[in-house]
């Protein structure tokens, strides 16, 4: 079986594939202070609770936007699974031309999503990934990664409001029932939620116009299912897009 690891700034998502089938997945908090052994103990316990053994893993692939943790997880793969992992980065075979001023600047997760999205839909795409930052990526009909936009994520935006405005509390991110709210908490939730829906739809609309195409719009990431119902532009939510992209990249780079 294949272990895929997606390291984000807020969460680490792990998945186990048996062939093309996702057998199990987990989401844990990203903690740059954790050691290799601490992550090893955590993963061992997750496997144990799922009735899986570390010896069932035959390969590991890692995508990371947190450089300090890349080495930690590489050592984990060597120490706990007895194998060197494939790490998404320069030199990896993606099968996708990257039309970026400096291809090395593109986050690994953005390329992984683009590969998975194009593999499934085989047409031009805008991929919206709701992570610590929200990314908007355009893939053209030829399967070329053309770039995109990056905006502050929902959680970052909400925390900034709490931290920088003395009288405003920390609030949960929810889909509110009304835009004209009658208390401070609900007013913040309405502004955050519907303001973010507007941000997403405006960026996507402008990207569509600039591309001079009619790309399909898909969303992924932890908060995609929260925003998508109110969005006028998001057509589908692909919950496991990044994990699926890692599986595809592993297959393309097998020796």
UniProtKB/Swiss-Prot annotation:
Q: How is the cofactor bound?
A: A monovalent cation. Ammonium or potassium.
Q: Which UniProt keywords apply?
A: ATP-binding, Coenzyme A biosynthesis, Cytoplasm, Kinase, Metal-binding, Nucleotide-binding, Potassium, Transferase
Q: What does the UniProt entry say about where the protein is found?
A: Cytoplasm
- Highest taxon listed in the record's lineage: Bacteria
State where ATP binds: 6-13, 132
Write out the residues that bind K(+): 129
Q: Which residues form the active site?
A: 109 (proton acceptor)
Gene Ontology terms: cellular component: cytoplasm
Q: Name one Pfam family in it.
A: Pan_kinase
Q: Binding residues for substrate, per the UniProt record?
A: 100, 107-110, 184
InterPro entries from the UniProt entry: ATPase_NBD (IPR043129), Type_III_PanK (IPR004619)
Q: Which GO terms describe its molecular function?
A: ATP binding; metal ion binding; pantothenate kinase activity
Q: What is its EC number?
A: 2.7.1.33
Q: Which GO terms describe its biological process?
A: coenzyme A biosynthetic process
**Which enzyme class, named as a word?**
transferase
Question: Reaction(s) catalyzed by this protein?
Answer: (R)-pantothenate + ATP = (R)-4'-phosphopantothenate + ADP + H(+)
Could you tell me which pathway this protein works in?
Answer: Cofactor biosynthesis; coenzyme A biosynthesis; CoA from (R)-pantothenate: step 1/5
Please tell me where this protein is predominantly located: cytoplasm
UniProt cross-references to PANTHER family, sorted A to Z: TYPE III PANTOTHENATE KINASE
HAMAP family per record? Pantothen_kinase_3 (MF_01274)
Free-text function comment from the UniProt entry: Catalyzes the phosphorylation of pantothenate (Pan), the first step in CoA biosynthesis.
Assembly and partners are described as: Homodimer.
Similarity annotation: Belongs to the type III pantothenate kinase family.
Q: What is this protein's record name?
A: Type III pantothenate kinase
Q: Record the organism.
A: Geobacter sulfurreducens (strain ATCC 51573 / DSM 12127 / PCA)
| Classification lineage | Bacteria, Pseudomonadati, Thermodesulfobacteriota, Desulfuromonadia, Geobacterales
